[in-house]
């Protein structure tokens, strides 16, 4: 048994530079002299020898005899391709530098037009690399970007580029669609804060052509440069939509953005929509990458801006006829075409027509009504566009002083930053859903709304319920009377909770909502806000917001209970 050392001996002893074979096998503390103390004590001093350390494969074989000859006898060194020009270097300093590249040639495949011939062990060769050829290590480390000196100008769109390793590093199509929520949020906020839109540019933009303005949303020349592009297609389009709050432009027709069935959409995103790869002949890419690009073009939805004539809000004077038509044509009972799901059948039309809450509240009064009557999915992008239009009205105005305009503009920018912090997550959660999934989410919302309306009837607190966009879907009669409104007037058309708040309360609400929209699963918020009556009087309320989330943990319904402060 090994003698137990005292603390002083343990402190004074020093490890040996290299242990002997016996001490190494027995895990003993060896000494520097030979034979060591352990071998002398055990009468095996004649066999006390230093342990031979293993050589790392990529190191030279100067310390181990025969290492080079063993490597040259391996089958890998017998593989040959076309010859490479070599030159003999007489310098001794070059000899030591060339030893490592020759030994490490097995780790990387040689170029197609080169090979390594068997060299005599007495000679040291230097491989001549042409100055124009790029080392493979640089190609592996450089991100997929195009050389700006070989870009095609927009004046000659029919000119083709010869894609070579000297002027182009082949981009990976998937690299255009990868990003994180934190990075994309930071990009959006930086873009929104750095862009300075003046009143004159807004007025001139409002009177110009719609297609031209859609291009101006990217840059004044109609193309985004490398520094102005986000790393996500969704964030590029998201920034365009948020920037529309300031740029009053005539937007393109919105297309379904939260479905994956966009094959018939001619406005789907493609790599050619980016300015830095425009006019590139993508036929020069290999076939697998072209298939990936085509798959992304067919599967990614397109986020467009604004209203068109057929989707614009109707005149309030014709609301009765308009909703009667919606009741007759768009919401029907169970069909008679055999058994099957009455909600999802062959006659169901997935449209973006808006159905006001006054109709849905009267149509779905029990849980069985959700299954016996046809249900339509809710088109959230159109609701966000209506919110955009409302925010421009609330924080706009030409009869204000420059100080008041600047104050309203600063509040608008705060709201923009808060929306940009959570909206990309909402899009990412719903972008791969099909129409049936959206119907399921709407059915979940309507089913939860039935329970909350029954609870509101048993509760004495004035209550308002709205979607995550702020669109009101239910209000109690006592709350409507406090605000000098009719509940039917607030539900017969698209109305937002922000229409009933003052400017500071709107900013406070978005601050609170942004904190619980993503990540934070807190379901109850207590605060105090000011509400506007129909006669423009302000009433201060203390309120409690209850958040109901969907299966993606995204806010689905916000239930606000208000108590006036006397």
UniProtKB/Swiss-Prot annotation:
Write down any Gene Ontology CC term: nucleus
State where the protein is found: Nucleus
Where does this protein have compositionally biased stretches of type Low complexity? 253-270
GO biological process terms held by the UniProt record: cellular response to starvation
List the molecular function annotations (GO) for this entry.
DNA-binding transcription factor activity, RNA polymerase II-specific; RNA polymerase II transcription regulatory region sequence-specific DNA binding; zinc ion binding
Q: Which UniProt keywords apply?
A: DNA-binding, Metal-binding, Nucleus, Transcription, Transcription regulation, Zinc
Query: What domain of life?
Result: Eukaryota
Q: Which Pfam families match?
A: PAS_13, Zn_clus
**At which residues is the DNA-binding region annotated?**
20-48
Q: Where is this region: Disordered?
A: 63-92, 250-270
Functional note: Transcription factor which regulates nonfermentable carbon utilization.
Q: Which family is it part of? A: Belongs to the ERT1/acuK family.
Q: What is this protein called?
A: Glucose starvation modulator protein 1
Q: Which organism is it from?
A: Candida albicans (strain WO-1) (Yeast)
Q: Which gene encodes it?
A: GSM1
């Amino acid at each position: 048994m090994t003698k137990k050392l005292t603390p002083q001996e343990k402190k004074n002893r020093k490890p040996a530079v290299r242990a002997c074979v016996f001490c190494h096998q027995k895990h003993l503390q060896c000494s520097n002299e030979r034979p060591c103390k352990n071998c002398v004590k055990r009468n095996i001093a004649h066999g006390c020898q230093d342990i031979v350390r293993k050589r790392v494969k990529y190191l030279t074989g100067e310390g181990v005899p025969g290492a080079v000859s063993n490597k040259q006898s391996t089958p890998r060194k017998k593989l040959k391709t076309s010859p490479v020009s070599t030159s003999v270097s007489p310098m001794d300093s070059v000899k030591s530098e060339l030893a490592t590249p020759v030994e490490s040639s097995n780790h990387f495949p040689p170029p197609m037009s080169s090979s390594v011939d068997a060299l005599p062990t007495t000679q040291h060769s230097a491989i001549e690399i042409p100055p124009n050829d790029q080392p493979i290590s640089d190609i592996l480390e450089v991100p997929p970007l195009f050389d700006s000196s070989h870009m095609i100008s927009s004046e000659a769109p029919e000119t083709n580029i010869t894609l070579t390793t000297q002027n182009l590093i082949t981009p990976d199509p998937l690299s255009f669609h990868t990003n994180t929520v934190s990075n994309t949020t930071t990009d959006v906020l930086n873009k929104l804060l750095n862009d300075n839109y003046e009143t004159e540019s807004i007025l001139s933009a409002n009177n110009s052509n719609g297609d031209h303005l859609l291009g101006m949303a990217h840059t004044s020349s109609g193309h985004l440069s490398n520094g102005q592009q986000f790393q996500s297609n969704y964030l590029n389009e998201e920034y365009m939509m948020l920037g529309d709050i300031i740029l009053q432009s005539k937007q393109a027709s919105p297309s379904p953005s939260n479905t994956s069935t966009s094959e018939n959409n001619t406005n789907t995103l493609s790599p050619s929509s980016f300015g830095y790869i425009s006019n590139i002949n993508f036929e020069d890419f290999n076939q697998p990458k072209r298939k990936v690009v085509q798959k992304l073009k067919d599967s990614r939805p397109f986020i467009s801006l604004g209203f068109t004539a057929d989707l614009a809000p109707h005149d309030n004077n014709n609301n009765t006829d308009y909703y009667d038509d919606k009741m007759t044509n768009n919401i029907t009972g169970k069909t008679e075409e055999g058994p099957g799901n009455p909600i999802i059948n062959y006659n169901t039309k997935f449209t973006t027509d808006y159905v006001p809450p006054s109709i849905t509240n009267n149509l779905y009064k029990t849980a069985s009504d959700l299954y016996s009557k046809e249900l339509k999915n809710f088109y959230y992008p159109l609701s966000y566009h209506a919110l955009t239009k409302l925010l421009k009205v609330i924080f706009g105005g030409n009869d204000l002083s420059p100080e008041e305009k600047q104050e309203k503009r600063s509040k608008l920018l705060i709201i923009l930053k808060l929306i940009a912090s959570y909206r990309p997550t909402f899009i990412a959660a719903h972008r791969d859903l099909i129409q049936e999934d959206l119907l399921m989410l709407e059915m979940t919302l309507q089913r939860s709304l039935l329970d909350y309306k029954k609870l509101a009837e048993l509760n004495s607190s004035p209550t308002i319920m709205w979607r995550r966009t702020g669109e009101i879907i239910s209000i109690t009669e006592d709350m409507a009377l406090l605000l000098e409104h009719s509940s039917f007037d607030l539900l017969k058309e698209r109305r937002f909770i922000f229409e009933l708040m003052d400017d500071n309360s709107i900013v406070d609400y978005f601050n609170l909502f942004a904190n619980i929209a993503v990540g934070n699963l807190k379901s109850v918020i207590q605060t105090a806000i000011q509400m506007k009556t129909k006669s423009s009087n302000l009433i201060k309320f203390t309120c409690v917001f209850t958040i109901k989330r969907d299966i993606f943990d995204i806010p689905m319904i916000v239930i606000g209970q208000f108590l006036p402060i006397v």
